[in-house]
């Protein structure tokens, strides 16, 4: 009986180092894969909330909240109040801008300077603002200017006196920048009807 016991002991005998290795293998199981996170763009979140898709809002260029009132959307642009300030009595005629009475000058020479316009328009009143629109590519004037007066009488006097006059070898046109009623077109040439080069057909 003792011999059998010794044989059994010899059969199950093992190295202590192998026992340590087995313990380490049992203590370090294969780590479980991390849970997949939902994209924040899709409306979910890494925190596990993200189930309320009905309240999800899409932000970015080209998107807007249609449920918001139209006035609130326009308020951010800062332009609605400006147009509300444009006064008018409802009839045809010039309209005052927010700051004053603005005169439009067309036919301006491409090399004209602000001083060239200021010197002739200041004779009719205080010029509050003068703007020359330049071409970014060439740096020359695009051909028109905006001049602002404080009073209606000053702007009207400048229009009557300077419309059709010469500035730097070019004839300028001076008129109201804002007005009610039909738009008055200037310097528009009427084209003659085209004539056919083919000989007229003979009628039988």
UniProtKB/Swiss-Prot annotation:
Xref: InterPro entries: Nucleotide-bd_a/b_plait_sf (IPR012677), RBD_domain_sf (IPR035979), RNA-bd_8 (IPR008111), RRM_dom (IPR000504), RRM_RBM8 (IPR033744)
Recorded GO MF terms: mRNA binding
Domain of life: Eukaryota
Keywords of the record: Cytoplasm, mRNA processing, mRNA splicing, mRNA transport, Nonsense-mediated mRNA decay, Nucleus, RNA-binding, Translation regulation, Transport
Biased composition (Acidic residues): 10-27
GO cellular component entries: cytoplasm; exon-exon junction complex
Main localization category: nucleus
Pfam families hit by this protein: RRM_1
GO BP term (any one): positive regulation of gene expression
Region of interest (Disordered), residue spans: 1-92
Family, as annotated: Belongs to the RBM8A family.
PANTHER family: RNA-BINDING PROTEIN 8A
Cited function: Core component of the splicing-dependent multiprotein exon junction complex (EJC) deposited at splice junctions on mRNAs. The EJC is a dynamic structure consisting of core proteins and several peripheral nuclear and cytoplasmic associated factors that join the complex only transiently either during EJC assembly or during subsequent mRNA metabolism.
Record-given protein name: RNA-binding protein Y14A
Protein source organism: Oryza sativa subsp. japonica
């Amino acid at each position: 009986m003792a011999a059998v016991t010794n044989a059994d002991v010899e059969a199950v005998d093992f190295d202590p180092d192998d026992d340590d290795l087995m313990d380490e293998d049992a203590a370090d199981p294969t780590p479980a894969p991390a849970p997949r996170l939902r994209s924040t763009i899709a409306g979910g979140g890494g925190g596990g909330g993200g189930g309320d898709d009905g309240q999800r809002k899409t932000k970015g260029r080209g998107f807007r909240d249609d449920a918001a009132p139209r006035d609130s959307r326009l308020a951010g642009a800062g332009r609605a109040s400006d147009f509300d300030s444009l006064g008018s009595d409802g009839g045809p005629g010039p309209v005052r801008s927010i700051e004053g009475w603005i005169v439009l000058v067309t036919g301006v020479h491409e090399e004209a300077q602000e001083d060239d316009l200021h010197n002739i328009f200041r004779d009719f009143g205080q010029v509050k603002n003068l703007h020359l629109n330049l071409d970014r590519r060439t740096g020359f004037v695009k051909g028109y200017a905006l001049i602002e007066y404080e009073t209606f009488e000053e702007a009207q006097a400048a229009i009557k006196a300077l419309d059709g006059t010469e500035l730097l070898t070019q004839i300028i046109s001076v008129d109201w920048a804002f007005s009610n009623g039909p738009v008055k077109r200037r310097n528009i040439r009427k084209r003659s009807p085209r004539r056919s080069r083919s000989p007229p057909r003979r009628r039988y």
